[in-house]
């Protein structure tokens, strides 16, 4: 049986080659017949035409059968019987020797230190080290001392021998606490060289974190000393400050009078100012008449007041304010405050005349254009 099946498997590719060649030949014959039929009748052949010719019908059937056999996969390999072959067994947990080492020396069973209770993972972990030395020797070599803040290749100077650690004397935000902070931090080898010289640090303390150096008692003493100086020497009070304050007050009064007059004048001149602005934006050809502003007479007039008396009064007021006394107003000041300046009121017009709404119409005539161009040129 085995011999017959093996011959079938050998002849299978030959049969496939023969069937494919015969199928190609049949296909060529069928195509030639179809072209001849199309030339003769002017159309492709149909099923009825194929059935009439028995030879052509046989070729069609044979071609269909060969095509079907070529598409179906041969099931020859399924019936092939194979004799069983003994597989190679790999026992990964085998610990018996003799085992060749990297240096070429053979280690027998009695020289190896094998424990029967170890698992496969522990065997892989014990491979580290030289094959000749035992595990006890390796453990002795690994018991060397390691400093936590240094590498085995670099020696680190002892900071505790040179610098004495003291208690923190300053607050948490004090710039004087930088030295104490540097002593308390544990440094790594990367930043160790930066903190070796703590005294010559390139950073300056921040001025924003400083607290007031003087206490409240010291500030109170200084205030009392300054107060005694003013009481003992009242003439030393600078007259320059009194003159400056007096002039500032006088200028403020004049400025307020000017503002009040300007508010009264703006009520009647709002339409004129708006009209002037409108002329500027639209760019009309009419010339806007800009009259000079009226000079304020009050600004040139000198106030009818005694400057020396006012200076003396201001000096007394400033001195009393420094001492914390209440300032008593004089009669002249109260009279000036009680009699404010009388404001002039504008009389309202009785009727709204139609002539107020009159506006000249500028027609773009030829003469007007010439005039406008001449006027623009003179300007």
From Swiss-Prot:
InterPro entries: DNA_rep_checkpnt_protein, Sld2. The keyword Cytoplasm applies. One of its GO terms (cellular component) is DNA replication preinitiation complex. Keywords: Cell cycle, Cytoplasm, DNA replication, Nucleus. Residues 368-379 have a biased composition (Basic residues). Belongs to the SLD2 family. This is DNA replication regulator SLD2. It comes from Kluyveromyces lactis (strain ATCC 8585 / CBS 2359 / DSM 70799 / NBRC 1267 / NRRL Y-1140 / WM37) (Yeast).
């Amino acid at each position: 049986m085995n011999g017959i099946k093996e011959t079938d498997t050998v002849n299978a590719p030959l049969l496939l080659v023969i069937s494919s060649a015969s199928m190609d030949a049949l296909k060529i014959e069928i195509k030639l017949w179809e072209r001849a039929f199309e030339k003769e009748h002017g159309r492709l052949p149909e099923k009825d035409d194929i059935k009439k010719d028995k030879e052509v019908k046989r070729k069609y059937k044979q071609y269909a059968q060969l095509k079907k056999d070529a598409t179906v996969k041969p099931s020859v390999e399924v019936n092939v019987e194979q004799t069983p072959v003994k597989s190679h067994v790999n026992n990964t947990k085998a610990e018996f020797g003799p085992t060749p080492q990297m240096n070429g020396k053979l280690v027998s069973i009695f020289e190896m230190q094998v424990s029967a209770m170890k698992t496969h993972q522990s065997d892989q972990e014990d491979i580290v080290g030289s094959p000749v030395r035992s595990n006890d020797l390796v453990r002795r070599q690994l018991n060397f001392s390691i400093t936590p803040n240094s590498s085995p290749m670099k020696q680190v100077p002892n900071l505790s021998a040179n610098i004495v650690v003291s208690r923190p004397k300053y607050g948490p935000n004090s710039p004087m606490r930088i030295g104490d902070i540097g002593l308390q931090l544990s440094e790594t080898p990367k930043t160790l060289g930066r903190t070796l010289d703590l005294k010559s640090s390139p950073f300056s303390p921040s001025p924003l974190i400083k607290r007031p150096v003087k206490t409240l008692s010291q500030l109170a003493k200084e205030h009392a000393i300054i107060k005694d100086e003013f009481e003992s020497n009242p003439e030393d009070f600078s007259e320059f400050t009194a003159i400056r304050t007096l002039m500032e007050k006088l200028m403020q009064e004049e400025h307020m009078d000017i503002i009040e007059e300007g508010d009264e004048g703006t009520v009647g001149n709002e339409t004129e100012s708006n009209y002037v602005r409108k002329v500027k934006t639209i760019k009309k050809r009419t010339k806007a008449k800009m009259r000079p502003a009226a000079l304020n007479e009050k600004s040139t007039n000198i106030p009818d007041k005694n400057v020396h008396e006012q200076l003396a009064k201001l000096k007394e007021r400033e001195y009393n304010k420094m001492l914390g006394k209440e300032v008593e107003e004089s009669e002249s000041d109260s009279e000036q405050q009680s009699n404010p300046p009388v404001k002039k009121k504008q009389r309202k017009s009785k009727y709204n005349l139609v002539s107020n709404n009159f506006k000249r119409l500028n027609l773009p005539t030829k003469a007007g254009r010439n005039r406008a161009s001449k006027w623009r040129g003179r300007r």
